[in-house]
Amino acid sequence: MQKKETLEFQSEVKQLLNLMIHSLYSNKEIFLRELISNASDALDKLRFLSISDEKIKIKQNKLCIFIDYDKNKKSITIQDNGIGMSKKEVIENLGTIAKSGTKSFIKSIEKSNSEKNNQLIGKFGVGFYSVFIVSEKVLVLTRSFKENEKNGVLWESSGKGEYTISNIIKKDVGTEITIFLKESEKEFCDELNIKNIVLKYSNHINFPIKLKTKITKDNKILTPEEKKSYTWKQINTGKSLWSKKKSEIKDIEYKEFYKNFFNDNYDPLIWSHNHVEGKQEYVSLLYIPRKASWDIWNREHKHGLKLYVKKVFIMDQSSEFIPNYLRFIKGIIDSNDLPLNVSREILQNNENIYKIKINLTKKALLMLENLSKNHPDEYKLFWKEFGLILKEGPSEDIKNYENVIKLFRFSSTYINSENQEVSLEDYVKRMQSGQNKIFYITSDNYLSAKNNPHLEKLKEKKIEVLLLFDRIDEWMMNYMTEFKKIKFQSISKYSSYLENIFKDENNDQKNTEQKLSTIILRIKSYLKDRVKDVRFTSKLTNSPSTVTTDENDITTQMSKLLISTGQESPEIKYIFELNANHPIIKHVFNIEDKNIFNNWIELLFEESILSERGNLDDPNKFIHRINNLLLSNIIRLN
């Protein structure tokens, strides 16, 4: 071995090492991921060169990563037979950070908090230095594929500002890194711990990762010699499922992978597997679960895809790749273009990530469309589990608005069932001649929607109405304004268009309203500013009266939603509508006694409010009024 040469780290490296040792990488185990990833890159480079250069001869099946450990020495060794490094390359790669903007990077670490520190380092690809978080000393033995065995290199450092480098004899091409752990970090020097870290971060590396493993024999007693013996055992899966061609994978493999990888007991409803090449290279594998996770509505619930870079696990719950309204999707994104230590900050501000998100969103929506068309029964299960979440889509995703809402399912007057099975396309196909709006009503529950007085005339005319009774629906309809250029119309809001539909062609209604017109003035005189207006309506057939909101006013359901979330709601002044053909209205018209008339009007107004809101400010007063009317009826009959 030649005389050791002592060199100082580049000044920025000194700062970086100091920062890393004292503040970076709260998740210390990442050092092993970094070293394995570097080894994998070295193997990849050698394999690529062997394909492009016939002079370079390698055996593909011999490319491997070995992990050795020694508890007595508190050391871990990661060895590969990859491309290796020359002395010059060792100095360039391990003694300096050949990156522009390094100084500003160091400053950004110094200013930011510890959580961001863990992420910022990844921007500059300096993951190798993470070894100094857990080690007292690091040895690197390497030999470039271009050099003979006499030109091996030994690099040694304790991470305290300088390193030594010398030439050694190294028989094999490749790199061997040995780290000597600090006393406080000796737990890493354990077979099971190493195995678990590899499975967590590097299970899908393309090359075999072999760990020094104690020899075991099932139900057999080991000899003293065997107890001291070890063997090399591959611990990673190797080629990841998602990196294979779709044609090579059976459905059962997709299902089993999903259940094992995402810890789910149920088969997925559907999946989408895509390889993208070109300016961006990545693989995505998206799954729709059969059941919602128990905490999906929890504010602290984390969602997103598992992010891999070149098959190295980077992070869970990468929410930047999928919109919030698709947060039920589970899956994997494996990119060839992102830096290994990509941070969430980079993900949030990266144009390429945004483009991937656009593509993945389209793939996810197409997957759901295929499920709805080809497996309607399975789609019913999906809608039951995730429909409420998908309904957040119109407010979040204008670009995919039409593709999102065509996936929605509703209850309607057509199916006469609480089941939400009607699509907007179904509704449009059944629209009446001349109908140019999609009618809907929002309510607290199915029965109150189904039996709402606003539906009476529409049912008679066999005009379908969507029944919306999920809590989110009223809020959703602020964003869901049209479908295929057909506007939505709430039937609980006053609309001249609706009134024209309600009116019959004969003049009976008009004549009756003219005869009873004075009742409108009497009611207005009594209710005064408690109502916005009083008018006759043609929408009612069985009910004597109802209330509706004006076209530009807040609806009852929106008011309830605001109050339930602790917000203030504007006061609603209803339009009080009367059915001139109803016997009760005709009876009240003929009442001359002011007190009795007012009592009847109060009763009709309150029951209309009760039907609309589901509650009254003073229900006891309402009950008392009913009892008085019943009592007066009994007295009159006797």
From Swiss-Prot:
Cellular localisation: Cytoplasm
UniProtKB keywords: ATP-binding, Chaperone, Cytoplasm, Nucleotide-binding, Stress response
The keyword ATP-binding belongs to this UniProt entry's keyword annotation: yes
Keyword Chaperone attributed: yes
InterPro entries: HATPase_C_sf (IPR036890), Heat_shock_protein_90_CS (IPR019805), HSP90_C (IPR037196), Hsp90_fam (IPR001404), Hsp90_N (IPR020575), Ribosomal_Su5_D2-typ_SF (IPR020568)
Residue ranges the record marks as coiled coil: none
Gene Ontology cellular component list: cytoplasm
Residue pairs linked by disulfide bridges in the UniProt entry: none
Residue segments, region B: 345-560
GO molecular function: ATP binding; ATP hydrolysis activity; ATP-dependent protein folding chaperone; unfolded protein binding
Region annotated C, chain positions: 561-638
Stretch list, region A: 1-344
Domain of life, source organism: Bacteria
Family: Belongs to the heat shock protein 90 family.
PANTHER family for the chain: HEAT SHOCK PROTEIN 90 FAMILY MEMBER
Subunit record text: Homodimer.
UniProt function note: Molecular chaperone. Has ATPase activity.
Name of this protein: Chaperone protein HtpG
Gene: htpG
